[in-house]
Amino acid sequence: MSAPIEHTDPVPSAAVLEPFGRSGRALMLGHVHPDADVLGTLLALGLALEARDWSVVYGGPHPAPALLAFLPGVDRYRRLDKLDGRFDVVVLTDCPNPQRTEGLIDQAKSAGKVVVNIDHHPDNRRYGDVNWVDPTAAATGEMMYELLMALRVALTPAIATNLFTAIHTDTGSFRYSNVTTRTFTIAAALVAAGARPELVSESLYERRAPDALHWLGEALARVEVSEDGRVGWLALPASAVPERIVESEELVNYPRSVASVRVACLLRELDGSVKVSLRGKGDVDVQRIAAQFGGGGHVNAAGCTVAGPLPEATQVVLAAVRRAVDRKGTS
């Protein structure tokens, strides 16, 4: 394609649909530490394309976490160091920054005829040949549902389960303010197509090993709240971070659950850097905080990675959070 295509409406345009009009070889490319929104959408689209005689490769810089092993087709998603062969289309979902592919995006642009970027983050870099970015979507799973409907895909229980899980997790089990009537309408259609909410919830929240509860207790003992009660945080050293990345990310919701807290932070020491997850309650834009450290996200949910040891990173991030909270308190 000569010039990048941009589309922001909830329903995909003809230009978004065009790369999927004929069969070929496709790459479903994920980002670092893939979560349920990226995995669910890539798997759903890949399964739909395979039903139309496409050859599909699934993978990214990191493998799928054990917590999401129940997703249909996830066993085919693998860690990729390099890309082999050519692709008619390369699809990235829920990935606002191409740097999150750890260099695989550069290989993809060389190996793929068309790079399709589908995302709901408002700060998406528009790095694809086709860029469909809809910040009004609660999850990229909503957008993928619309794409499959526009392509006249018959939803299977496997596809429906992947998309339902994507939406379920990105809305905090339908608890967050990003949930709309559209969210529930799509979720209902996915349940009608064979997704089972009780099995998704059980797989995500009720299959812990006994020692996981002990680890959870140790982690929660580290929760701190500022003197004024408006900032809550949890700083985890590398020795305390489990392999189940998705589950540990949910820890940020514990300080967020404190009534007085306006911004909650989870800081996890990983590979010599600190991964930061930020959550707000609507009155402080945590995306702006994350942007100060090269990150991004949404108004109420954002993240970034900060260099340096955990104590120093915690101090720097909390200072930025306090400034944001104080500005809001005086505005």
Language model region names:
Residues 72-74, 80-130:
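Active-site cofactor/cluster-binding pocket
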Residues 2-32, 40-69, 84-87, 168-329:
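Hydrophobic helix-and-loop "lid/oligomerization" segment in the mid-to-C-terminal part
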Residues 118-186:
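Short alpha-helices
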Residues 79-81, 103-107, 131-134, 152-154, ...:
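A generic local secondary-structure boundary/capping motif
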Residues 48, 106-114, 150, 181:
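A glycine- and small-aliphatic-rich helix-loop capping segment at beta-alpha/alpha-beta transitions
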Residues 32, 36-38, 95, 120, ...:
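Generic detector of well-ordered alpha-helical packing
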Residues 41-44, 72-74, 104-108, 130-133, ...:
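Short, glycine/charged-enriched secondary-structure capping and boundary segments
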Residues 36-42, 98-102:
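Short glycine/serine/threonine-rich phosphate/pyrophosphate-binding segments
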